[in-house]
Amino acid sequence: MKINKIKIQNIKSNAWKFWALLLLLFSSIFSANAQDTIKVQNHIIDNQIQNQIFKYPVVYTNSNIKDFTFTEVSYEHQQNEFARKQVANEINTYQFLAQGYFTTKSRWKLFGDLAIKKILEKNLGWVLSDDRAIEQEVINPHYFYVPRKADWDNQVYALSGGFSKDITNHLSVAVKANYGTEKFSRTLDARSQITNRNLGGEMQIGYQITKNQKAFILGSYAENQKDFTFKYNNSNLNLEVYPETYLRFNAGYGRILNSFKSSGSGYLYQDIVDKIGLGYTIKGKNSIFTALYYAQNSNNIFYTSDLDLKVNERMKIKTKSNHAELFAFHKWNKKEIQSTLQFDQSDAKNFDKQSNGYNYTNSLNKISWTASLAQKSDSKIDYLVGLNLLYQQNEYDDVLSTTHIELNSLNTGIYTSKDFAFNKSKLNATASFNMYFPLPSKLDYYDTSGGTNIRFFDEVIIYDYAVNTTNYFEPELRLQYSYPTKNNKTVVFFTNLKEKIAVKKQTDYPVSINTNTTYWVQMGVQLNY
């Protein structure tokens, strides 16, 4: 049955009206008084304000933010039972994370992040790229695959940082840069090896309209390059008589091609991403309100060589995205409230130079809202309650396979947290409960390959559709014990436990999926100051 689709243009129109109403509502509580110091904790209680400080530093050039440094070493085990097909059965992650924010005597604000990860995946099939269907409903096309499952050994290094400063009484600037490198290696035929290099930068310029109002613009550019190679220790396994290991290429979502030889020593993916946007913020002594919008373009090119020459171009996929965001923060007495409302919309379309046409498109729409109310006594959390909502309306279409999917869903959640203080130390308990509701969705498929592509449809497309249209419950519990040491440093020992429990399958397709509980366990130590 075809669903009645919500008109996105109406959502956009209503969102802008809502922004104007919120701005009018909050304007009465903003004054030109000096703003109180913002103290950020390494805890879910400050996730929203922390995210704003690092994403849009130009907004906070004249804010008093207490210096902080967070470091973490942790281990995470993820056992995937109820999950999409292109996800490893087991994932073990060892990671080191660091984050810092400092203000110099001359009022330069410096900030940065560092992440080092070792990721071991067990039993991953149907994809030879570095993309995974953990957060994505559908992996972007243009990747090699074999059905056979194998283990992966992966390394991730990511570094980002920047600065911000008021240049004059009216002009402020913020500059961010990021660099990352990744290596993914599969341990069985077909043995793929992937090396990623990411480099990007962003500039934000603000103009102080009045003492408590600022307008700003932002622009960014990033270039991501991915080298892909594969080899067989037993070359006979790359023959059509061995379907488990015979190399295929997914040119859409169901349009499957036989693999093609490289004209060099491997293959290359190049992704160019640019972004431009604008925003407005108003601040009071105890309040912040920010509204912003940006548009982003991505052009991802697949080359049948390791050289990025025009003659080697084979596939392209272009994505146009729009993002709108509202953030509000207010505190009074010992209480504070934070709220983030976001709207994301994107359209993607691929192009095959050899056939001189396209076959794959997607249209993704998302509205998310997170809000929290907390009471603090110095660094002690008396209580925290919050909620989050995520509505998604996504459409995927491959005109040559032929596959058409409409996925609609609502994810709702609540969370709470509290500190239990002792003489010097404290114990924090945080619990969250999320529920995923699939809304009326649709899957149409007609096999135009004469049966050669039917296995991908049966084992990936239908299977994932059944997972995406199954209700699930996701509870999480986090415990952390904090103990202060010398020089205002705090050592934190923590553990997380999260489960994903399938509740009810909605699809009528005759497919059997694994509904055993998926779970995550994480433990680690932090040094915060």
Give names to the regions the model predicted.
Residues 37-38, 211, 516-529:
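Outer-membrane beta-barrel "beta-signal"
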Residues 65-71, 106-112, 169-173, 211-215, ...:
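Outer-envelope beta-barrel architecture signal
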Residues 71-77, 112-118, 175-181, 217-223, ...:
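Transmembrane beta-barrel strands of outer-membrane/channel proteins
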Residues 81-88, 123-129, 184-192, 228-234, ...:
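Outer-membrane beta-barrel translocator domains and adjoining extracellular loop/strand segments
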Residues 87-95, 150-168, 174, 194, ...:
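Outer-membrane beta-barrel transmembrane strands
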Residues 98-102, 159-165, 201-207, 276-284, ...:
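Residues on the lipid-exposed face of transmembrane beta-strands in outer-membrane beta-barrel proteins
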Residues 249-391:
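Long, internal scaffold/assembly segments composed of regular secondary structure
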